[in-house]
Regions:
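Beta-strand/loop substructures that line and gate deep hydrophobic ligand-binding cavities in soluble
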Residues: 77-79, 83-133
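Generic structural detector for well-ordered beta-strands
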Residues: 17-23, 58, 66, 94
Length: 140
């Protein structure tokens, strides 16, 4: 039996997930994350609102994708392709109520290498850092 390295799936390439519990209720987190200011924090500037299943987007930095599914106050699943990348990755934003607030989770799969996995881990951690600052400074 061959064991795969952490993060390597059988058929979806490499994957990574990053989460943090923020001191905010799920509804308020959802409203902020899908607002123009919130979308700019995690997806990029220029994303059309409101997000709806099936729409395509292109951010001001050239990242493109399509909203695959959207379950209000729960999750958004989308394709994500930054400039220079040859294929889409899949990104999920998942919210879950906790005793101390809202767990915000970003999950990426269809990554091409362990190096890309680590880069995405750093990217999503940075996003969560910025969201934490925005929420704690009452920008929501």
């Amino acid at each position: 039996m061959t064991t795969r390295p952490t993060g390597l799936t059988k058929d979806a390439g490499w994957q990574v997930g990053v989460s943090r519990t923020l001191p905010i209720e799920v509804g308020a987190a959802w409203d902020y994350l899908l607002s123009p200011a919130g979308l700019a924090h995690w997806l990029g500037d220029g994303v059309p609102t409101p997000l709806e299943k099936g729409i395509t987007y292109k951010t001001t930095d050239g990242t493109t994708g399509q909203i695959r599914s959207l379950h209000p106050r729960d999750r958004v699943r989308l394709t994500w392709r930054p400039p220079g990348r040859r294929q889409d990755t899949i990104v999920q934003l998942v919210l879950q109520s906790t005793a101390t607030g809202c767990s915000v989770r970003f999950h990426s799969d269809r990554l091409t290498s362990q190096r890309e996995r680590e880069a995405m881990r750093a990217h999503w951690r940075n996003v969560l850092d910025r969201l934490t600052v925005a929420i704690s400074s009452d920008d929501t």
